[in-house]
């Protein structure tokens, strides 16, 4: 698939990206290389490959949850940048 400068401008507009006109040709080249690589990957025979979530088998090491004392509240709160009324103070992030 051949990528054109107009394709780059169109995708940039859709993504609301401000790309300098001087960078358009570099993106044409880079995205062209990426699509060529994807095309190469599409040629790999994967019909008999079982779908997987990870390339290697992983096993989770679970343990039982146990309730225990956390420690002295004052000592824990001393590690916080800000605390009040035995609670951590955090900046407001939602209006």
From Swiss-Prot:
It comes from the Bacteria. Heterotrimer of A, B and C subunits. The keyword Lyase does not apply. This is Aspartyl/glutamyl-tRNA(Asn/Gln) amidotransferase subunit C. InterPro entries: Asp/Glu-ADT_sf_sub_c, GatC. PANTHER family: GLUTAMYL-TRNA(GLN) AMIDOTRANSFERASE SUBUNIT C, MITOCHONDRIAL. Belongs to the GatC family. It catalyses: L-glutamyl-tRNA(Gln) + L-glutamine + ATP + H2O = L-glutaminyl-tRNA(Gln) + L-glutamate + ADP + phosphate + H(+); L-aspartyl-tRNA(Asn) + L-glutamine + ATP + H2O = L-asparaginyl-tRNA(Asn) + L-glutamate + ADP + phosphate + 2 H(+). One of its GO terms (biological process) is regulation of translational fidelity. Gene3D superfamilies: Glu-tRNAGln amidotransferase C subunit, N-terminal domain. The lineage of its organism: Bacteria, Pseudomonadati, Thermodesulfobacteriota, Desulfobacteria, Desulfobacterales. Pfam families: GatC. One of its GO terms (molecular function) is asparaginyl-tRNA synthase (glutamine-hydrolyzing) activity. Its EC number is 6.3.5.-. Allows the formation of correctly charged Asn-tRNA(Asn) or Gln-tRNA(Gln) through the transamidation of misacylated Asp-tRNA(Asn) or Glu-tRNA(Gln) in organisms which lack either or both of asparaginyl-tRNA or glutaminyl-tRNA synthetases. The reaction takes place in the presence of glutamine and ATP through an activated phospho-Asp-tRNA(Asn) or phospho-Glu-tRNA(Gln). Keywords: ATP-binding, Ligase, Nucleotide-binding, Protein biosynthesis. The keyword Nucleotide-binding applies. It comes from Desulfosudis oleivorans (strain DSM 6200 / JCM 39069 / Hxd3).
């Amino acid at each position: 698939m051949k990528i054109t400068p107009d394709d780059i401008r169109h995708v940039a507009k859709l993504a609301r990206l401000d790309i300098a006109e001087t960078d358009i040709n570099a993106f044409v080249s880079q995205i062209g290389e990426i699509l060529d690589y994807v095309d190469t990957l599409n040629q790999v025979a994967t019909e008999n490959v079982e779908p997987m979530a990870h390339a290697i088998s992983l096993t989770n090491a679970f343990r039982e949850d146990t309730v225990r004392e956390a420690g002295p509240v004052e000592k824990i709160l001393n590690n916080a940048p800000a605390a009040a009324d035995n609670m951590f103070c955090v900046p407001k992030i939602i209006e």
